[in-house]
Amino acid sequence: MKFPADSNLILIMPGHARYRDPKTFEMSPALVRVRAPYFWRNTLAFIVVGSIPLGVYAYTWSFLNKDEFSDIPIPPVSDEELAKLKKEYANKK
């Protein structure tokens, strides 16, 4: 089925694409008007939902930053064993 080149058939465009400019994909004034009442509500929801993982991250960072790991004993390493480990490490690079 062929259509004339100058026809503007909305039927061949998906439903959501009718509210965008087919050349630039910018929102049409109708889409801007429809989305306007939800802008501040969506912004607030984004801030609330986004602050939860950021709060967990900040709490974890502050909690782990206080830990000194002084209660973990470090096994003694002799100079020969340290030289051997350094040589192994250099060979792996």
Swiss-Prot record:
Residues 1-43 are mitochondrial matrix. GO terms for cellular component: mitochondrial inner membrane. Keywords: Membrane, Mitochondrion, Mitochondrion inner membrane, Transmembrane, Transmembrane helix. Residues 65-93 are mitochondrial intermembrane. GO terms for biological process: mitochondrial cytochrome c oxidase assembly. It is found in: Mitochondrion inner membrane. Its main location: mitochondrion. The keyword Mitochondrion applies. It is a single-pass membrane protein. Pfam families: Coa3_cc. The chain crosses the membrane at residues 44-64. Required for assembly of cytochrome c oxidase (complex IV). Belongs to the COA3 family. Component of 250-400 kDa complexes called cytochrome oxidase assembly intermediates or COA complexes. This is Cytochrome c oxidase assembly factor 3, mitochondrial. It comes from Meyerozyma guilliermondii (strain ATCC 6260 / CBS 566 / DSM 6381 / JCM 1539 / NBRC 10279 / NRRL Y-324) (Yeast).
